[in-house]
């Protein structure tokens, strides 16, 4: 999403506020580096969209693709990606305090819960 204005918040939002991107970054901050592991942390995200988001994050310098095996690359956060850690942490804390909608049955996923407590 482009805001079309020179504002640091708008520029940051163009990168990290795309749908699913904060969850992808959070999953990578938790240690996932392989596509399949990142995907496991965001199971409702399509593989196509995850691939697109990783390539976008690579293009803007938030992640980098590494690995000798091109069929199983590793995705690593760059210094810029790691700098998002407090942002993601505070976003989660804000959600705990202020996103008070009642939990719906479809919000609960045992697979995601178990993956996140690893």
Each language-model region and where it sits:
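N-terminal helix-turn-helix DNA-binding core of bacterial DNA-binding proteins
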Residues: 7-48, 71
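Basic, amphipathic "hinge/linker" alpha-helix immediately C-terminal to the N-terminal HTH DNA-binding motif
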Residues: 17, 69-90
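Residues within the DNA-recognition helix of helix-turn-helix
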Residues: 53
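Glycine-centered, phosphate/nucleic-acid-interacting loop/turn motifs that mediate DNA/RNA or nucleotide
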Residues: 61
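Short beta-strand "wing" residues that participate in macromolecule-binding interfaces
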Residues: 65
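Amphipathic alpha-helical dimerization/coiled-coil segments
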Residues: 86-118
